[in-house]
Amino acid sequence: MVQKGVVFGVLLILFICSTLTSADSKPNPTKEEEPAKKPDEVSVKSGGPEVSEDQYRHRCCAWGPGRKYCKRWCANAEEAAAAIPEASEELAQEEAPVYSEDQWGRRCCGWGPGRRYCVRWCQNAEEAAAAIPEATEKAQEAPVYSEDQWGRRCCGWGPGRRYCVRWCQNAEEAAAAVAIPEASEKAQEGPVYSEDQWGRRCCGWGPGRRYCVRWCSNAADEVATPEDVEPGQYGRRCCNWGPGRRYCKRWCHNAAEEATLKAFEEEAAREQPVYSEDQWGRRCCGWGPGRRYCRRWCQSAEEAAAFQAGEVTASLMLIMFKACPCMGPVPSV
C-alpha cells in the first residue's frame, strides 16, 4: 500500500513539471514588441553634431563649458534639429568679454579674484552687455580693490596681503578709506605692529613671535615693553622662568614686584648650596638617585640648612660603620 502511494506521488510530480515546461515554451501574446526606431531619430543621429540622450529620451541640444553639464534639453528630434543652427550661431558669434553660463542660462558678468568665483550673474544678453562698460570702468580705477561674493571691496589689507582687515560697502567708502592719513602714518611708524581683522595692533609678542599676547586698540594703549620681558595675556610679566624657559613659575603685576623678586634671587644666588625652587617657592633639600626627582622640599633656607647638616652627619656615620664592621649592623639612613 505504501509503495503504491509513493509511485502515485512521483507520477503526480512529473505531470506537474511537464505542464509547467510546456506553458513556458508557448509564446506570450500579451508581450509587446519593441517599436522600431523612427526614421527621423536615425537621420538626426547620423548627422552632426551628435546629441546625448537621458533616461526620458530627451536630447541635449546645448552643452555648458567643457561639456560638463547640459544647459538645454529637447523633447523630440524636431526640436533638437531646430536647436542645432541656433547653437552654431552662438558659437560663431564673437562676444567680448566671454561669459560663462550656469545651468539656468544666466551669464557671469563679474568675476572675483583669479576668476575663482562669480560675484555677479546676469539674466540675459542685454544685462550682460550693459555690465561690460561698468566692468571696464572698474578695471581703470586706481587703486584696485578685490571684491567678495557680496560686492564689498577690501580697503585695508593685513601683513603680506594674506587677509583683509577692513571691508567697504561701496566705491565712496573705499575712496574715503584711501585718503585716511592714519594709513600712511601707520606705514611710517616703528616698530611695525601686525593688525587683526578688528584693526587692533599687536603690542606684545610671545616666544619666537609665534602668537600675540597683548592687543592694543589705539596708539595710547601701546606701551614700550623691554625685549627681555614677555608680557602675558593679562598684562603681567614673567619674573621667574622654569628650566629651559618652557614655563613661568612666577608672574609679577608691576615693576616694583619684579624688582623685589630680582633682589631676592640675587640674595639666594649667593647662598651655598644652591637649591632648586618650584612654582610655590619651595626648595629641594633632598634629591633622589641621579637627581631625577626631589625626595624632600623645604619651606625656608633655615630648614634647608638644618636638613643638609643632618644629611652630612648621617653620611659620616654610614662611612664609619662600613669601615669598621665590629660596630654592628649598618643603620638605615
Swiss-Prot record:
Coiled coil recorded as keyword: no
Signal sequence residues: 1-23
Propeptide, chain numbering: 24-54, 75-102, 123-148, 169-196, 217-232, 253-278, 299-333
Keywords, comma-separated and alphabetical: Antibiotic, Antimicrobial, Cleavage on pair of basic residues, Disulfide bond, Fungicide, Plant defense, Pyrrolidone carboxylic acid, Repeat, Secreted, Signal
Major localization listed first in the record, in broad terms: secreted
Compartment annotation: Secreted
Disulfide bonds: C60-C70, C61-C74, C108-C118, C109-C122, C154-C164, C155-C168, C202-C212, C203-C216, C238-C248, C239-C252, C284-C294, C285-C298
GO biological process, one term: defense response to bacterium
Region (Disordered): 23-52
Sequence positions bearing Pyrrolidone carboxylic acid: Q55, Q103, Q149, Q197, Q233, Q279
Keyword Secreted tagged: yes
Domain remark in the UniProt entry: Contains repeated alternating basic mature peptide and acidic propeptide domains.
Protein name: Antimicrobial peptides
Lineage of the species this protein comes from: Eukaryota, Viridiplantae, Streptophyta, Embryophyta, Tracheophyta
Gene from which the chain derives: AMP
